[in-house]
A protein has these predicted regions:
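Metal-dependent catalytic cores of enzymes that make or break cyclic nucleotides
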Residues: 6, 10, 20, 27-247, ...
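Acidic, low-complexity intrinsically disordered segments
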Residues: 1-3
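Charged substrate- and nucleic-acid-binding regions of tRNA-handling and nucleotidyl-transfer enzymes
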Residues: 249-299
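Boundary/linker elements of alpha-helical solenoid repeat scaffolds
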Residues: 14-17
């Protein structure tokens, strides 16, 4: 009996080591893939992938999905456009209704390309299925398979809404380095500059809920988007040393390393996990020692 217990303990330790190795490999792969996705984001004000990932996860939690589902949706949202890597610029900055037939034909391939890239990597099988469906619409008018209603994965239905919103409000026909005139100087200028696009996007979601998009998902997301704008209105822009940056603050500019990797994107919320990395990048001269963030007006000294 003692030998059996010892063998069970050895097997448990081996499984734990294997699980740890698999988890480490998964996150290393995810880090590499998310960096690759950055090459598709030249025509966005801020990081499209990071925004869609953050808000899709928030939305999934609000809708009551379990922890594992939320995690898979967050990863799928981060990588949902990986199939666009290598696409012509016209497939990156144009909206689908602006594309020529040959441009749209290429664009429509990206969910399948994304699935093919990911499906054979350990831990990405369900994630690749969500990515494959993120352009499906509940009335069957989406692609690649014209799925309807409950045929669509809940995660894909969530990403579809957030993806539409961020494209509608933050996509631009100019590359990031040409967008200096859009830099946030104060919260009111940001709200004014995005007011028209925000109102148009919210109106479209309201009109198309229950038709193109899941009704519950749209209603929950619209509440999030409205609240986010209210939060911004109570903040001010301040340049702070990286060691004074706190979770919950919001980046006002995009920050890149010397080799072009996006470290923090405009509009992205600071998380606790970012703090150490920001300090290290600043110490190594990859980002400024002081960065622009939105802070609560009451916290300004």
């Amino acid at each position: 009996m003692e030998d059996v217990n010892q063998r069970v303990s050895e097997l448990e330790r081996m499984v734990n080591r294997l699980s740890g190795d698999l988890a480490e490999n998964f996150f290393q792969t995810l880090q590499i893939l998310s960096s690759i996705v950055g090459f598709t984001e030249r025509f966005y004000d801020g990081s499209h992938a990071k925004y869609v990932s953050e808000k899709s996860a928030e939305l999934a939690r609000i809708l009551g999905l379990g922890r594992e589902d939320v995690f898979q949706i967050k990863v799928a949202a981060l990588l949902h456009d990986i199939g666009k890597v290598g696409f012509y610029d016209s497939a990156l900055y144009k909206y689908p209704n602006e594309m020529r037939p040959n441009e749209f034909a290429q664009y429509a391939l990206h969910p399948e390309i994304g699935r093919q890239i990911l499906k054979n990597h350990h831990g990405f099988d369900n994630i690749s299925d969500i990515i494959y469906q993120h352009h499906e619409k509940i009335d069957g008018s989406g692609f690649p398979n014209g799925l309807k209603g409950n045929q669509i994965h809940p995660g894909a239905a969530i990403i579809s809404v957030v993806n539409y919103y961020h494209n509608a409000v933050y996509k631009t026909k100019r590359e990031r380095d040409e967008q200096s005139e859009n830099k946030i100087t104060n919260t009111q200028s940001y709200l004014n500059n995005t007011k028209e696009k925000f109102s148009s996007a919210m109106s479209f979601l309201q009109q198309k809920k229950g038709i193109l998009f899941d009704r519950k998902v749209v209603e929950a997301f619209m509440a999030i988007a409205e609240m986010d704008r209210k939060k911004v209105s109570g903040k001010v822009v301040q340049r702070l040393p990286v060691n004074l940056i706190k979770p919950g603050m919001m980046f006002v500019e995009n920050y890149y390393t010397s080799f072009g990797l996006l470290i923090a994107s405009r509009g992205e919320s600071v998380t606790k996990e970012m703090l150490g990395a920001l300090v290290r990048f600043a110490e190594n001269g990859e980002i400024p020692h002081k960065i622009l963030v939105l802070v609560e007006a009451d916290d300004v000294k």
